[in-house]
Amino acid sequence: MACPFFRRADSLTRQPSVIAEPGGHWALEDEELSDDALTLTHLQMAIQLLTAPSNEDLNTAVTSLVAKYRQNWPNIHKLKLDPQTFKSCANYDYLADIQELLLKMDEASASEILVLLGEELITCCCTGIIERAFRCLGTDLQEFLGSLDGVYDVLKLQEEDVTDTGFVCAGEGELIFTSERPVIAWLLLGSLKALTRMLYKVDVNIKIEPVEGDARRYRYLFSLVKDNSQTMLMGRPTSVSKTIPETVQRSNSSNASDLQMNSSSFCKMFPWHFIMNEQLELVQLGRGFSKLYKPYMADFGCQATTYFDFKRPKGLTMKFRDIVRRTYTPFLIGLNNPPGAVDFPAIGLEIKGQMVHCPESNSLLFIGSPFLDGLDGLTCNGLFISDIPLHDATREVILVGEQARAQDGLRRRMDKIKNSIEEANSAVTKERKKNVSLLHLIFPAEIAEKLWLGSSIDAKTYPDVTILFSDIVGFTSICSRATPFMVISMLEGLYKDFDEFCDFFDVYKVETIGDAYCVASGLHRASIYDAHKVAWMALKMIDACSKHITHDGEQIKMRIGLHTGTVLAGVVGRKMPRYCLFGHSVTIANKFESGSEALKINVSPTTKDWLTKHEGFEFELQPRDPSFLPKEFPNPGGTETCYFLESFRNPALDSELPLVEHINVSMKTISEGGDA
């Protein structure tokens, strides 16, 4: 035989990977496999070992092969690879590399090595649940080959596999395998040898030969080795017959008249059967087929293809001999509309069953059942439950299918209700987040949470709170000369900057009334830098005034007052509640603002004491006269006075840098836990 790998140069391209990739045909890794229960997934894995072994399984088999046959082929160790090689590349095709290495190493022995590799593949990897999956296919080799044909056909249909790979059990001891990869065909030869020994304790010779006219098809012919003289070709020991009762061992008659059932009873028992002769002419119909087609046969003949469409197996040639070769494959037959028939009730009905060769009459017997999924499919095809034999499991399939459909309908309704509830919950959660966010904009976080939960909020005293009051100099005059829209637009631009300062310095905006803007620090998160934050904000507010003008082009001028002291804070009102500050310190802070001047920051003695605990704040050289102190401010001995805050310089920075740079760096430092 010519080299098994001979092919044209253009066919030496890399073949598609045989790895079970995520989302691919096999996708076995994603399923949870039971250690005990045999499932369809295990059958998939078992047959994949024959048709598309994984890189891991191949590497295991190669390792064993190298250990056993290193002396026979010194260079065989080159086939072995580090597992990381193909683990790092999901699409790596190990089998293609094995094929190329064998062609370079020893072309004459390439097929022999591949057969041995197939045997090692079964020996090393066919264990546990995979071995059980192979054993469930049949009690002997012939049954195994026949089941391999039928099971693989079903698996391909379920996985929507459009490749040409497949098995055909063409007769006793004959298997035809289709594959575009010759290397798989030779690997399968060794795998079948090892499986025969493992499962049925039989040594067989398997001859492989190409099928004439199709380079992708290979025929495997099984023959028994001489040492197994006590064993039949297909694995059944001849000694078993000794245990069978003598009455059962009687040879069956091939005379139809000796059958214990007449044709009428057979047609009644199996309504969905037919028998056809070598010319594929119908010679007998079951009661179900007879009811549908008998009126038309007198006019249109008895040719089977007139009434039946053979849908599966795929690629079946409508010749008697070819059908006989596919008797191990499930058949799916569709019912045709008879010529001239009007309103044929069973058009499109499919019958699934088995084709049996009857050598005594050289005919073919088909026995099947309607391929239905529910009562609707039954009635739509003009059938009744009575048309399904009592022994046929299709009855249970139809009735159980209806029950499952009702359960699915209930499940879908429940899922729809569940989705509606989840959508409603999601909408409620979304609205809740909006409301909570809005409350956090108006109130301190602790107060906002209590308001949302509906908890009672008691007024609370806070010590060392630094309060800022500000207003616009000449605001009444500005309002008298401008329209309300102009005034609102001016305040909107100015207060937008101030609100950003509140977020940056983490201070609480108490309220705005007209041109008055009030903030406080030390309410929601007390810190030794509360006075510093308010002072820095005051400096940035004065700086921001230079960037805003009135309607007539004049610069906005503000005056600001700062004071630090104890305040009482609480929520007032139920409709549109407000978080208000009360106490002597609030009044004094407002007085310091009234006693300030345009573009000046009037600082109380208590606030100055807090600011001077750290370097950087600059005040006017000459303190103000004590008479400028508010009358409400306690000043025993008349030694205290107020001060104008002029600027701030971070000692660690160049003094020539802008004021904003000094403030931003200092704020960043204390935010990170450092010392301003």
Curated annotation (Swiss-Prot):
Hydrolase as UniProt keyword: no
GO molecular function: GTP binding; guanylate cyclase activity; heme binding
GO CC annotations, alphabetized: guanylate cyclase complex, soluble
Compartment(s) of residence: Cytoplasm
Stored SMART domains: CYCc
Domain of life of the source: Eukaryota
Pfam families in the record: Guanylate_cyc, HNOB, HNOBA
Record field: catalytic activity: GTP = 3',5'-cyclic GMP + diphosphate
Role, per record: May have a role in phototransduction. Catalyzes the conversion of GTP to cGMP, a common second messenger that is utilized in a wide variety of cells and signal transduction pathways. A second subunit is required for enzyme activity.
Name of the featured protein: Head-specific guanylate cyclase
Tissue specificity annotation: Head, where it is preferentially expressed in the CNS and the retina. Not found in bodies.
Native source organism of the sequence: Drosophila melanogaster (Fruit fly)
Main location group: cytoplasm
One example of a Gene Ontology biological process annotation: visual perception
Enzyme Commission number: 4.6.1.2
Span of domain Guanylate cyclase: 466-593
